[in-house]
């Protein structure tokens, strides 16, 4: 199975990818880690990889027989949607995402949740901006996912996500 999970910041992509990976044994890849390399010396806590390195890492993942990818739907990873057997768009409510953004930011600042960036006020502001860009369609995530309607499943709520995980469990049984 080649699964691509896409959605805005704090929609639950990473959590769902890990859960699917645990249920199926298929490795999951967080594409933020393909774009960014952790670097504690940098003010942001990471740096952007050169495009050539990013693309090399991404194509190595796509060459695998199976994978679970998760990302915000960046244009540079559109090929991942093309190769996927199934695409999941997490279209959770803005209120839920904003709550998760704040909760995550607090947990990261108290070192209760790991992160590959510095959880400062700039990052908090950016997360709210990215969430809003999804809501308005400015980021193009929904539009890109809808290009693949024949293999797209849109999940809107934690209940729908739970039902999706149950269906994956039953497929594995």
Residue ranges of predicted features:
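NTP-dependent small-molecule kinase module
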Residues: 132-173
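Short, structured coil segments at secondary-structure junctions
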Residues: 24, 83-84, 148-149
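Conserved substrate/cofactor phosphate-moiety recognition/catalytic segment
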Residues: 18, 22-65
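Glycine-rich phosphate-binding loop used to anchor ATP phosphates in small-molecule kinases
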Residues: 51-96
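Hydrophobic anchor at the beta1->P-loop junction of P-loop NTPases
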Residues: 5
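A glycine- and Lys/Arg-enriched "phosphate-lid" helix/loop adjacent to the NTP-binding pocket
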Residues: 92-137
